[in-house]
Amino acid sequence: MANLRKTHPLLKIANDALVDLPAPSNISIWWNFGSLLGLCLAIQLLTGLFLAMHYTADIATAFSSVAHICRDVNFGWLIRNMHANGASFFFICIYLHIGRGLYYGSYMFKETWNVGVVLLLLVMMTAFVGYVLPWGQMSFWGATVITNLLSAVPYVGNTLVQWIWGGFSVDNATLTRFFAFHFLLPFVIAAATLLHLLFLHETGSNNPVGLNPNADKIPFHPYFTYKDLLGFIVLFLALASLALFSPNYLGDPDNFTPANPLVTPPHIKPEWYFLFAYAILRSIPNKLGGVLALLASILILMLVPILHTSKHRSLTFRPFSQIIFWTLVADVAILTWIGGMPVEDPYIIIGQIASALYFLIFLVFFPLSGWLENKLLGLS
């Protein structure tokens, strides 16, 4: 009798994705982040579901309902801390996953890559609306500042902003719809993740040398199930340590003050994982220009496969492109730092230079170095 996992219509899908999947034998630890993102999504869905059971999406009670969760609900403090810090780990994994894709040329799987960029946008949107829910000062003013950016849209801008607000300012209607979006979007993300995997399994995984690995493949289970399990343990230990020992380390102290439309916090800034994009937004002294740069900073990832000029797929054997890649990593770190700084003298110009460099690396330096390396290696 044939094995049930290979014949049952549902189990067969899981088997082909998690057990008998042929995987390149040489994929490194950098290939762990896909499954880690799946784990992050599962943690966020579970903790979020339990938080939603006790949270009230009303401006009169939202802040105190979060306090109630932390004080009175059994392990509510833990669920809330795991959820808030889980978002940070989600973004750490996403950025490492994207960095891996850029370094090893995984973007040559165009469908997988583009679904991935859409996933990034969905996760960013979910995190933004989620940050508004505790209804602290930074929640309120963050929502006000970021939704206000839509008023830069020509002709329909102001109407659009009022439509999203459900009134003439960020108010109860805004909070309730943001809660609805924050509940719904993770399920959309889960669906898009399946699409991401579907496209990936059409081609099979890339590998560190960027060559066709078909001659040397091994089953996903047991080799990579155990390798992923190690990653799960490390991620879970790190998340638990942060949530238990310093749960507020990455948060903003202003969010411990209930939202007050009459008092503006001295520095309005998003969570750390949006700071690089926020720095790019602020570096352009024009509202519409800033919004377009903000969008471009993410959507530029979709251009990467089109601008690939090298005959080599990965950067493993391309020293010039490696230097440019690590310059990009340093540049994003600088942008993250600048995004959290006040808008004053040295920071403004540093942010503008870093923003210009960010776009130049993608649009000019990567294609040029690929072309140059082809010439030097006689591959033209």
Swiss-Prot record:
Segments crossing the lipid bilayer: 33-53, 77-98, 113-133, 178-198, 226-246, 288-308, 320-340, 347-367
Binding site for a ubiquinone: 201
Main subcellular localisation: mitochondrion
One MF annotation (Gene Ontology) recorded for this entry: metal ion binding
Matching InterPro entries: Cyt_b/b6_C, Cyt_b/b6_C_sf, Cyt_b/b6_N, Cytb/b6-like_sf, Cytochrome_b, Cytochrome_b_C_euk/bac, Cytochrome_b_N_euk/bac, Di-haem_cyt_TM
Residues reported to bind heme b b562: 83, 182
GO cellular component: mitochondrial inner membrane; respiratory chain complex III
Domain of life per record: Eukaryota
Hydrolase is among the record's keywords: no
UniProtKB keywords: Electron transport, Heme, Iron, Membrane, Metal-binding, Mitochondrion, Mitochondrion inner membrane, Respiratory chain, Transmembrane, Transmembrane helix, Transport, Ubiquinone
Matching Pfam families: Cytochrom_B_C (PF00032), Cytochrome_B (PF00033)
Protein location: Mitochondrion inner membrane
Membrane topology: Multi-pass membrane protein
PANTHER family recorded: CYTOCHROME B
Family stated for the protein in its record: Belongs to the cytochrome b family.
Further comment: Heme 1 (or BL or b562) is low-potential and absorbs at about 562 nm, and heme 2 (or BH or b566) is high-potential and absorbs at about 566 nm.
Subunit structure: The cytochrome bc1 complex contains 3 respiratory subunits (MT-CYB, CYC1 and UQCRFS1), 2 core proteins (UQCRC1 and UQCRC2) and probably 6 low-molecular weight proteins.
Protein name: Cytochrome b
